[in-house]
């Protein structure tokens, strides 16, 4: 081996390995201090791209869970208000039944009606003041809202809220009033026993297309006016018949989803003088000062309660769906974060071993470099 002083190959080699050990030590210290084994694209370009994509998905899932919880909160707020509205209308129904009793005087019915009117005001107050985050929920202004319950576009759920104001036509129906009263001695004429009520857009034709729904009733011959009302009530849950004190028949038809004008026809309709121009009746229009009005109020309130109950059922289903969505989102986020951790996070057991190895190599390299720098001094002994 040649002895030279201009080029110290041994020192250069020792310095190269020392630099390598120092770089490895710095990398290990960076990974241990940051907690991530990928701190820049040079560490793992492909891994960084995958990790960033998983991070975006995880953060999106976190926001989606908050959105779903907001949806549950809105549904709970609206459903709680509807529960109170139901209690109000149940009380009004009790009053209507009480007012229908023949023992009540006009003054007593007037007092009952005043309480009913106060409850109508309370129902409207509930509808107008129930809000969430500044948005009114039950006065008809909310409409439909989309709740983003996923980390990607298109993963939304639509929630709709409708009005429960007392003057909403869906909170009631229409009433056909008879112009001719019948006494106890009257009986259904078998030649005029047919009655047909047509509800536009509530049925289907043979091809499954939207069509009118026809409720055909053939009354029993000889039935008096009260027996006729009882018979009509048993034919469909969409209609309710009652009789006033003067023997006049009134038929109430609930129509929350009817599109168009409801009509009535048939021999019985002509016999009783049932007008083909029904009166639209909502909770706002209830009048309990007469037996006829009280009887009609019962039917209107039954329709309104059914309508509100259907809205509450829909909100309950939405809440359950959102709860399951949150559980699913949490499960997805857990697995996404676990995958991201395997790609990006530092394995401390492995990295501390690497750091210890790099420290030893750095110390050894420093010592060897110091010795290698002394090798040219051996040339001086040849000059002595």
Swiss-Prot record:
InterPro entries: Flagellin, Flagellin_C, Flagellin_C_sub2, Flagellin_hook_IN_motif, Flagellin_N. PANTHER family: FLAGELLIN. Gene3D superfamilies: 2.60.40.4390, 6.10.280.190, f41 fragment of flagellin, N-terminal domain, Flagellar export chaperone, C-terminal domain. GO terms for molecular function: structural molecule activity. The keyword Secreted applies. The keyword Coiled coil applies. SUPFAM superfamilies: Phase 1 flagellin. Belongs to the bacterial flagellin family. Heteromer of multiple flagellin subunits including FlaA, FlaB/D, FlaC, FlaE and FlaF. Homomer of FlaC is not able to form a functional filament. Keywords: Bacterial flagellum, Coiled coil, Secreted. It comes from the Bacteria. GO terms for cellular component: bacterial-type flagellum; extracellular region. It comes from Vibrio parahaemolyticus serotype O3:K6 (strain RIMD 2210633). Residues 317-347 form a coiled coil. V.parahaemolyticus possesses two flagellar systems: a single polar flagellum propels the bacterium in liquid (swimming), while multiple lateral (peritrichous) flagella move the bacterium over surfaces (swarming). The polar flagellum is synthesized constitutively but lateral flagella are produced only under conditions in which the polar flagellum is not functional. It is found in: Secreted; Bacterial flagellum. This is Polar flagellin C. Flagellin is the subunit protein which polymerizes to form the filaments of bacterial flagella. FlaC is not essential for polar flagellar synthesis and swimming motility. Homomer of FlaC is not able to form a functional filament.
């Amino acid at each position: 081996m040649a002895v030279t002083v201009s080029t110290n190959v041994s020192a250069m080699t020792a310095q190269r390995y020392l630099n390598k050990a120092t770089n490895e030590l710095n990398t290990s210290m960076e990974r241990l201090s940051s907690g991530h084994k990928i701190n820049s694209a040079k560490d793992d370009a492909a891994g960084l791209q995958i990790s960033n994509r998983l991070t975006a998905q995880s953060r999106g899932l976190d926001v989606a869970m908050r959105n779903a919880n907001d949806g549950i909160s809105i549904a709970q707020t609206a459903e709680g208000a509807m529960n109170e509205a139901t209690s109000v209308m149940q009380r009004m129904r009790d009053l209507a039944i009480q007012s229908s009793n023949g023992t009540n005087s006009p003054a007593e019915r007037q007092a009952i009606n005043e309480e009913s009117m106060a409850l109508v005001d309370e129902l409207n107050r509930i509808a107008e003041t129930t809000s969430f985050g500044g948005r009114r929920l039950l006065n008809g202004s909310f409409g439909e809202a989309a709740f983003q319950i996923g980390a990607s576009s298109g993963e939304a759920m639509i929630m709709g809220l409708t009005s429960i104001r007392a003057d909403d036509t869906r909170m009631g129906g229409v009433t056909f009033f008879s112009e001719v009263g019948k006494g106890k001695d009257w009986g259904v004429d078998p030649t005029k026993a047919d009655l047909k009520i047509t509800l536009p857009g509530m049925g289907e034709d043979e091809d499954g297309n939207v069509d009118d729904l026809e409720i055909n009733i053939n009354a029993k011959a000889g039935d008096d006016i009260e027996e006729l009302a009882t018979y009509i009530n048993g034919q469909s849950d969409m209609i309710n018949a009652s009789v006033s004190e003067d023997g006049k028949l009134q038929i109430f038809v609930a129509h929350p989803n009817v599109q168009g004008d409801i009509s009535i026809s048939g021999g019985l309709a002509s016999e009783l003088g049932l007008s083909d121009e029904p009166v639209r009746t909502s909770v706002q229009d209830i009048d309990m000062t007469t037996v006829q009005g009280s009887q009609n109020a019962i039917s209107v309130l039954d329709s309104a309660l059914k309508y509100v109950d259907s809205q509450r059922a829909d909100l309950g289903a939405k809440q359950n769906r959102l709860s399951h969505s949150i559980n699913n989102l949490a499960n997805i986020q857990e697995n996404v974060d676990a995958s991201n951790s395997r790609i990006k996070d530092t394995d401390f057991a492995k990295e501390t071993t690497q750091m210890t190895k790099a420290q030893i190599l750095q110390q050894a390299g420093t010592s060897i470099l110091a010795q290698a720098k002394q090798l040219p001094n051996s040339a001086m002994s040849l000059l002595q």
